[in-house]
Every structure is written in C-alpha cells, then in structure tokens.
Amino acid sequence: MTKTLTQHLETIKREGKGIFLPYIMAGDHEKGLAGLPETIAFLENLGVSAIEIGLPFSDPVADGPVIEEAGLRSLGHHTSAKSLIASLQKLDTQLPLIIMTYFNPIFQYGLKDFIKDLARTPVKGLIIPDLPYEHRDFILPLLEDSDIALVPLVSLTTGLERQQELIKEAEGFIYAVAINGVTGKSGSYRNDLDQHLSKLHDIAEIPVLTGFGVSTLEDVDRFNQVSDGVIVGSKIVKALHEKDASIAAFIQEAAAYKK
C-alpha cells in the first residue's frame, strides 16, 4: 500500500508545482508545545506542501547551530517525545507532518509504543538521521501496518550503487543532503551538486527533495530544476524565534513555485 505522504507529494509534483517543506522545532516557542498549533496554522496558510517537525535531542549530530540552539530552547520547555505526541494527537491539520528525530528518543520511548502512538497523529513521515541503513529493520517492520513512511537520507558522498540500495522501496520522499556537514551551512555547495541531484532524481521512483543549507529563493529555484522541491530549516527556525515577519513572504513565494 502506497503511503499517504508519497501520494500527497506525487500529486503536487503532477500539478507542476515545486514541493516545499519547512522545518520547525517542536516546543521552540514562547508557549512551548502550546504554541505548536499556531505555528502549523501559520505555515499551512502560506501554502506549504507538508511540515517537518523536529523532536529535540541533547546530542543532535546532524544539526547546525541554529537548530541545535532551538532544540536546547525546546528542551528547556520540557519537550519530550511523549509530550509532543500528546500534542499532535489533539492537532487539527490537513497537512501531512513529518517527524525528524534521533534514534535515542525513540528507543527510550519504546519502539513499538512510539510508532503505535505516532500513528494516532497527523504524522505521515519519519526521518532518523543517525539510523544506519543496515539497522533500518529496527523500525521498518513496525511501520508496515501504519501510514507512516521512513524517509531515507542520501548524501553527496553516496555512490550510485549505494543510492539505489538506499532508495529501493522507499516511501514518502528521498531526502537529498546538499552539503557535507550539518544543517544551515549555506553557500558551500560542491561543483557537482546539480549533476548529483539530477542523477538521483533520474533513478528515484518517488519525489526527491533537497535540504541542508537551502536558504534563499535562488536556492529554491536552482534545486527545483534538478529535484522535486526543497526543505528549508535553519532560516525558518531563526526567523520564527526572532519574530521576523519577512519570513512569511519568503515561505509563500517558495511554496508557490511553479515548474
């Protein structure tokens, strides 16, 4: 059975639109998790395709400074897997949500219980950046009877054979990592990045979204040429924290991108 997230993003792709996913950190709001519905409604009204939500962890190996600091603020508001899931279970949204977190919080929660409880929310995708491909069977069997897709990350250093292995039977979308490093590190793209993304796009059977370091409308345009859309995190997290109202215009324009 094709997962809802895959179908939703494929529909946007068929309509000739670029897919736009904003990333936010759960609990990084002056109201803590109580502010999450407000942030999701704000993004939904701007026309985003889906929303990626970070669940904070104290040792976030893939996060750059902006998202790491947001995670610390969120932990300061006592955000946990249990409190986030409880909040999401009450949420009313038409958009599919994607949780990005590390394996440890899921393990501490209990793998079966985490997936079972997450399945009662609007979450349709799960990204675990520190879960090696070889260990994906810790999670995949638990997702078989759910409508939650495990989203694979593919880095620039991944060879073609390995790429094909990573994306085989993948659901949701392929998360193409645009830089070798952590999130938010913009302006340091490799010369062969576009070629790398084009090749990945050619072999993928589901949408390919480019993330890590994407921060300008020029980036949005560039990566929509060689993939199906973009994920923007650090820029949005920083703007929301600083109450920078100009972020709304950026999100709206990026979300309205036409191929």
From Swiss-Prot:
Q: Which UniProt keywords apply?
A: Amino-acid biosynthesis, Aromatic amino acid biosynthesis, Lyase, Tryptophan biosynthesis
Question: Which sites are catalytic?
Answer: 52 (proton acceptor), 63 (proton acceptor)
The keyword Lyase appears for this protein = yes
Q: Output the Gene3D superfamilies linked to this UniProt entry.
A: Aldolase class I
Q: According to the UniProt entry, what is the EC number of this protein?
A: 4.2.1.20
Q: Which PROSITE patterns match?
A: TRP_SYNTHASE_ALPHA (PS00167)
User: InterPro entries from the xrefs?
Assistant: Aldolase_TIM, RibuloseP-bd_barrel, Trp_synthase_alpha_AS, Trp_synthase_suA
Top class in the EC scheme: lyase
Q: In which pathway does it act?
A: Amino-acid biosynthesis; L-tryptophan biosynthesis; L-tryptophan from chorismate: step 5/5
Gene Ontology molecular functions: tryptophan synthase activity
Any one cellular component term from GO for this entry? cytosol
Q: How does it assemble?
A: Tetramer of two alpha and two beta chains.
Task performed by this protein: The alpha subunit is responsible for the aldol cleavage of indoleglycerol phosphate to indole and glyceraldehyde 3-phosphate.
What family is this protein classified in?
Belongs to the TrpA family.
- Entry protein name: Tryptophan synthase alpha chain
Can you name the source organism?
A: Streptococcus sanguinis (strain SK36)
| Annotated gene | trpA
